[in-house]
């Protein structure tokens, strides 16, 4: 498979599924670590919660997917190293992205958005990014679309 196809495949899957894995973790974290009644409030605003998580997490997840797709063959072919690189890359890219967003300040228009991106809520940013990076790096080779051969690009390589 060509590198460009792998970059598109990994990037899109990471961007679509990565934030959803983060939301799943946050819902479980709120249910077990906080009051379970808070979960009822989140379920009531779940579409807004999903939209907010996708808008804040899709770009870092896309960049993490591109990074995992561009890993050298020795690292990318071994599951444990790929998961380690995906998890660390997810955290680093998410923190850089959040720092840029907070620095711009024009994009952080709502108070909720500013609270999520502030330094006070590391659990909301780092752990979902770490888990999404590890899980997506682990399952990315099993997702459909990776083994499709294309006669136009196969003849070029």
UniProtKB/Swiss-Prot annotation:
Record keywords: Cell inner membrane, Cell membrane, Membrane, Transmembrane, Transmembrane helix
SS bond list: none
Family statement: Belongs to the CbrB family.
Keyword Membrane applies: yes
Coiled-coil ranges from the UniProt annotation: none
Intervals, Cytoplasmic compartment: 1-11, 58-83, 137-157
Localization: Cell inner membrane
Protein name: Inner membrane protein CbrB
Periplasmic membrane side: 33-36, 105-115
Gene from which this protein is expressed: cbrB
Main location group: membrane
């Amino acid at each position: 498979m060509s590198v460009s196809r792998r970059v598109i495949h990994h990037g899109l899957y990471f961007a679509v599924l990565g934030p959803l894995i983060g939301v799943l973790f946050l819902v479980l974290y709120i249910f077990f670590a906080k009051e379970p009644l808070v979960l009822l409030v989140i379920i009531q605003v779940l579409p807004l919660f999903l939209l907010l998580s996708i808008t804040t997490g899709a770009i870092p997840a896309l960049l993490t997917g591109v990074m995992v797709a561009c890993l050298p063959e020795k690292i990318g072919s071994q599951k444990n190293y790929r998961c380690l690189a995906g998890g660390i890359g997810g955290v680093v890219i998410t923190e850089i992205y959040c720092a840029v967003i907070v620095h711009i300040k024009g994009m952080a228009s709502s108070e909720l958005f500013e609270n999520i991106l502030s330094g006070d809520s590391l659990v909301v940013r780092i752990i979902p990014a770490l888990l999404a990076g590890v899980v997506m790096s682990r399952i990315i080779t099993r997702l459909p679309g990776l083994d499709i051969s294309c006669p136009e690009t196969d003849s070029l390589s």
